[in-house]
Amino acid sequence: AEFETLLYTHPIINFFGCSYVNVERVGKVWFYVDFEGLAQHYGIPTRVFDFSNDLSTAAFFAVTSYDSKTEYYTPYIPNENVKLEDKYGVLYYYDVMIPNLDTNSRPLGMSFFNRPGAQSGYAYTLNDNKDLNIEPQVKKLFFKHDGYVSKMIYNNMAKGKLLFPTDTLCRKAKEICRFDKCSKLAFDLWAK
């Protein structure tokens, strides 16, 4: 809720919000801001799982490890001493061909902020502590980790810099994650 109150201070979000806007020669167009999906993309824990409709982006996240202390990704390079299950990775994908009116998946890439667009982001909501591994439209592709390939994918994405462009929300989202309290405005929004 704190992130949502922050977003409402942005002039474009404040103007459009979640509303219909009359577009000449088109008619009414619904503008929707996925606050929870955006929060997840900026590192705020939510019930949303990030997907991408770009294979290079998905591959980057499948072959890298994230260090929360340094806030950097590094290529995952297995050595001969790792456990068998750590030698394999998984690439999750959302099967759009399964007929289902699933509203858990929605695009984030067309937003007013850089990061979701750079990652071709999709948000998938996991309601009620559901397990991603048993969701009918979520499929898995297993692969064997290879250090050379991990480094190649990592370097092709400029060590992640292409996926994490700096924008106005990055610093603010980090501040929100460090808070142990919330504003009254955020609490009131959450309580609705």
Please provide the spans of the model-predicted regions:
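Catalytic-core elements of nucleic-acid end-processing and repair enzymes
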Residues: A1-K192
